[in-house]
Curated annotation (Swiss-Prot):
Residues 1-15 form the signal peptide. One of its GO terms (biological process) is negative regulation of antifungal innate immune response. The keyword Transmembrane helix does not apply. Belongs to the serpin family. Disruption phenotype: RNAi-mediated knockdown results in the constitutive expression of Drs. It comes from Drosophila melanogaster (Fruit fly). Expressed in the ovary. It is found in: Secreted. This is Serine protease inhibitor 42Dd.
Length: 372
């Protein structure tokens, strides 16, 4: 449940978890477009950790790679991350919005919201599930508001039944402009080779400029970094040489931290839009988070009833749109494009590729484009 809601590398708050989440989702959704926000998933699960006790807390700590059982330390760590995001007055808009909804048949532990409200900029909220469609509409409207209208239908009304105890909702909104924009006048109709035997029509953007890029022989792939305006965020694109080389490449670039070199590049990149939805329970169970979803779950820091409760649902929905301006941008500003002659590198993303949106420390989005 994330907006723009994406690859991986260096360290997010819990880098190893980010890698594993993406790998699991990638393998369970083969041959399709994918976009995920690992940091969003980590944040909402760390919120749950704040209300967990006993073996449930230890399970979350282990799966998330949290360095300490000290909840104040965990809160401080995520508080610093979210404060940094809120402090960005220029450049891309990047907003994380998390909420835990609890069936109002179960009383909330009021100390829980006191513990998470400031560091996580969020809280748990009671909700009536006597009317599932009404409850779903309320949650969906909140997600819609948090994502500037991009994430619609987050919760299936049919899933909101009275036996649901708690569900986790997370949205992340991103809007950024390229530091070097594509000129819309240079965008042309073209084709994208999905497989060796299948192609689809696309609108192919083009520009020439200086970018950090490189070709890695052992990866058999080109890598290019596209920075965002007034920001330390960038999108890195991983383009395999072979049309059907993405699967092998995704295995190799886990933990990618290779040097890129500033060079003149003639770049062609398709406009694309990705929407991805998944229920994360099965994925999280594979990460080792199992007790949370059973009657043995100890969430006595979240529920007033010491018998606690379990999490019934972890929904994830992501949306990403890339065009001439950047990510989820509106309007158009023309940029001069000179002749291609003399440029040392040609990168044409006309077949499946992987991407990441990140800064030096945190993975915000990761995904792949199989068919724009």
């Amino acid at each position: 449940m994330y907006y723009l809601c994406i690859f991986l590398w260096v360290t997010s708050v819990a880098c190893q978890t980010s890698k594993e989440i993406y790998q699991l989702l990638s393998k369970s959704h083969t041959n399709q477009n994918l976009v995920v926000s690992p940091v969003s998933i980590e944040t909402i699960l760390s919120m749950v950790f704040m209300g967990a006790e006993g073996s449930t807390a230890k399970e979350l700590q282990s799966a998330l790679g949290l360095p300490s059982e000290d909840k104040e330390a965990v809160a401080a760590r995520y508080g610093a991350l979210l404060n940094d995001l809120q402090g960005q007055e220029e450049g891309p808009i990047l907003k994380l919005a998390n909420r835990i909804y609890v069936n109002d048949q179960y009383s909330l532990n009021q100390n829980y919201n006191l513990a998470v409200r400031e560091p996580f900029k969020s809280e748990a909220e009671s909700i009536s599930l006597t009317n599932g469609p009404v409850a779903a509409e309320r949650i969906n409207q909140w997600v819609l508001d948090q994502t500037s209208g991009k994430i619609k239908g987050m919760i299936d009304p049919g899933s909101m039944t009275s036996d649901v105890k708690a569900l986790l909702v997370n949205a992340i909104y991103f809007k950024g402009q390229w530091e070097s924009k594509f000129d819309p006048a240079k965008t042309r109709a073209s084709t994208f080779q999905v497989t060796a035997n299948k192609s689809v029509p696309v609108q192919m953007m083009a520009q020439m400029g200086t970018f950090r890029a490189n070709y890695f022989r052992d990866l058999d792939a080109q890598v290019i970094e596209l920075p965002y305006l007034n920001s330390n965020l960038s999108m890195t694109i991983f383009l395999p040489r072979e049309v059907e080389g993405l699967s092998a490449l995704e295995e190799k670039i886990v933990g990618f931290a290779r040097p890129l070199v500033a060079k003149e590049v003639y770049l062609k990149l398709p406009k694309f839009k990705i929407e991805f939805r998944d229920e994360l329970k099965e994925t999280l169970e594979k990460l080792g988070i199992r007790e949370l979803f059973t009657d043995k779950s100890d969430l006595s820091g979240l529920f007033a009833d010491k018998s606690g409760g379990k999490v019934s649902q972890v929904s994830h929905k992501a949306f990403l749109e890339v065009n001439e301006e950047g990510a989820e941008a509106a309007g158009a500003t023309s940029v001069a494009v000179t002749n291609r002659a003399g440029f040392s590198t040609f990168l044409m993303a006309d077949h499946p590729f992987a991407f990441v949106i990140r800064d030096a420390n945190t993975i915000y989005f990761q995904g792949r484009v199989v068919s724009p």
